[in-house]
């Protein structure tokens, strides 16, 4: 075999795949946290009043005032707020890395970029 038959090739750069997967995971996580219903169950197995209201029949009466508007967003839960904050900070740090990638020339005249 000749030496020309075996060429070295650079490995496949799969960085963009990981970026897309990370952004997809972040979008799904944020959508899940903002769209889930964390209101308390009020009523019985037939009558549900999660947003407040009144019901009255011959044997029972239910009067439930609406919860405040802030409790509809599940980020007020301590665990979800912490998870969202960590996720947001991670995305901001990761995104700032790509925004700030420029050729930085040192005072000595050399380009010391890592790529």
Curated annotation (Swiss-Prot):
InterPro entries assigned: Plant_vir_prot (IPR001896)
Lumenal side: 35-74
Gene Ontology biological process terms from the UniProt entry: transport of virus in host, cell to cell
Record bears the keyword Ribonucleoprotein: no
Subcellular location: Host endoplasmic reticulum membrane
GO CC annotations on file: host cell endoplasmic reticulum membrane; membrane
Cytoplasmic topological intervals: 1-13, 96-115
Keywords, sorted A to Z: Host endoplasmic reticulum, Host membrane, Membrane, Transmembrane, Transmembrane helix, Transport, Viral movement protein
Entry's transmembrane regions: 14-34, 75-95
Known role: Plays a role in viral cell-to-cell propagation, by facilitating genome transport to neighboring plant cells through plasmosdesmata,.
Misc note: TGBp1, TGBp2 and TGBp3 seem to act together for cell-to-cell propagation. TGBp1 is the main movement protein that physically cross the plasmodesma with the viral genome. TGBp2 and TGBp3 would facilitate TGBp1 function.
Family assignment from sequence similarity: Belongs to the Tymovirales TGBp2 protein family.
Protein name: Movement protein TGB2
């Amino acid at each position: 075999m000749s030496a020309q038959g075996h060429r070295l090739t650079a490995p496949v750069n799969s960085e963009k795949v990981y970026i897309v997967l990370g952004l997809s995971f972040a979008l799904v996580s944020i959508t899940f946290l903002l769209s889930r219903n964390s209101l308390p169950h009020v009523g019985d197995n037939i009558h549900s009043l999660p947003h407040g209201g009144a019901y009255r029949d011959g044997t029972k009466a239910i009067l439930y005032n609406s919860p405040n508007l802030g409790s509809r967003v599940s980020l007020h839960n301590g665990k979800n707020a912490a998870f969202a904050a960590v996720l947001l900070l991670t995305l901001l740090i990761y995104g700032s890395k790509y925004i700030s990638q420029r050729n930085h020339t040192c005072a000595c005249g050399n380009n010391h970029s890592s790529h």
